[in-house]
Swiss-Prot record:
Official protein name in the record: Large ribosomal subunit protein bL27
SUPFAM superfamilies the record matches: Ribosomal L27 protein-like
Pfam families hit by this protein: Ribosomal_L27
Gene: rpmA
GO CC list: cytosolic large ribosomal subunit
Length: 87
């Protein structure tokens, strides 16, 4: 007879990868055209000036410039990119 108990196995121990959503570039940061600004599901933040929207609602910069978060209405946020003034 065995003097040690056999080790059981478990069916747990797996988890799915998180979706990595959220703001990727914050207000005041300098971005290049094509940089992702916000990854989101649905339009939590709307595209403003010089910002494009991908098929999965990802917002990205269309030009080089500075990121600004603004309010479209009282409750709707938008993100815009404004060109850096040449000095």
């Amino acid at each position: 007879m065995a003097h040690k108990k056999g080790t059981g196995s478990t069916r747990n121990g797996r988890d799915s990868r998180a979706q990595r959503l959220g703001v990727k570039r914050y207000g005041g940061q300098v971005v290049k055209a094509g940089n992702i600004l916000v990854r989101q599901r649905g339009t939590k933040v709307y595209p403003g000036n010089n910002v494009g929207r991908g098929s999965d609602d990802t917002l990205f910069a269309l030009i080089d410039g500075i990121v600004t978060f603004e309010y479209k209405t009282r409750s709707q946020k938008k993100v815009s990119v404004y060109p850096v003034a040449a000095e």
